[in-house]
A protein has these predicted regions:
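Conserved catalytic-core motifs of GNAT/GCN5-like acyltransferases
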Residues: 122-123, 141-155, 238
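Short amphipathic alpha-helix that is part of the acyltransferase structural core
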Residues: 2-60, 168, 188-189, 193-196, ...
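Non-catalytic, surface beta->alpha helical segment in thiol-disulfide oxidoreductase systems
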Residues: 234-254
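Conserved acetyl-CoA-binding loop-helix of GNAT-fold acetyltransferases
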Residues: 90, 96-111
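Conserved GNAT acetyl-CoA-binding A-motif
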Residues: 111-129
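A short, internal acetyl-CoA/4′-phosphopantetheine-binding micro-motif in the GNAT/acyltransferase core
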Residues: 86-95, 125
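Conserved beta-strand in the GNAT
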Residues: 56, 60-71, 84, 89
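A conserved beta-turn-beta hairpin within the catalytic core of GNAT-like acetyltransferases
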Residues: 72-85, 95, 173
């Protein structure tokens, strides 16, 4: 990694003008297009005009932060004048060079410059693999402000106000047998995950439905916490972690 350069020289923010040519950090392809990346690119094209921010290391590496105004964030969280962090991820060569801190600080600086009341993100009592590192967030002052089952809404308030989970998100039950997955296109990994899970469930006679969350309104009314994926088994909410076939098989064997 380059040393001694200014942060704004190392980070790049996606815009409608550069979205088509910039890589999306967590899945980087040089020749063939990845369907999940292209689905996310289309999704981002609709979100950027709403104030959605995707900021990344200006290199072919995985180091980025993604956040949006809470009012237009596709999550069942309510509040005024907050930013919501979907993802903060650094891996591979950039790890250990302070880019996670730089990315987080860029978000917090952005929030203050825009006069926001604070910044929030989804966490859990036990760290989930597909959520941003909440211990890292705690170093900046993020703390739990609401709870839904084992999940927590973490917030850093600048003015003493706080967001909350939507009432529906605390329900965490639905009337459906087998596997139910709610998903959107925010994460590039989801496209292939859904395709493979559909095939697995069909091939193993597992009742399953996959519900594409395709609007802000639908996301705000979901019956569980959600960042970009939520799984139920026999009507009971399980996790925001993306599942594979063997994980579903274990659920059936319970």
């Amino acid at each position: 990694m380059r040393e001694g350069t200014e942060m704004d020289e190392e980070l790049i923010t996606l815009t409608p003008e550069n979205l088509a040519r910039e890589h999306l950090a967590c899945i980087i392809r040089t020749r063939t297009a990845h369907p999940g990346v292209e689905a996310k690119r289309v999704w981002l094209a609709g979100r950027l005009p709403e104030g959605h921010v995707f900021r990344k290391l200006n290199a072919r590496e995985c180091a980025f932060i993604e956040y949006a105004p809470l009012e237009t964030a596709w999550v069942p969280v309510l509040g005024k004048n907050y930013l919501y962090i979907y993802c903060l991820w650094v891996q591979g060569a950039p790890k250990g060079h302070g880019f996670g801190r730089r990315l987080m600080e860029s978000c917090l600086s952005d929030a203050r410059a825009k006069g926001k009341s604070g910044v929030c993100m989804l966490g859990a009592k036990k760290q989930k693999a597909w959520l941003a590192d909440q211990r890292f967030a705690g170093k900046f002052g993020f703390a739990p402000v609401d709870q839904a089952g084992e999940y927590e809404l973490l917030a850093l308030s600048f003015d003493g106000t706080y967001p909350r989970f939507a009432p529906e998100a605390k329900r965490q039950t639905i009337d459906a047998p087998g596997l139910t997955v709610y998903y959107d296109d925010q994460c590039p990994y989801i496209f292939e995950r859904v395709r493979k899970l559909r095939e697995y469930c069909a091939g193993h006679d597992i009742p399953a439905q996959f519900i594409h969350v395709d609007s802000l309104e639908a996301a705000k009314r979901l019956p569980c916490v959600f960042n970009n994926w939520a799984a139920f088994w026999d009507g009971r909410f399980l996790t925001v972690n993306q599942l594979d076939g063997p994980a579903v098989e274990k659920l059936r064997e319970r």
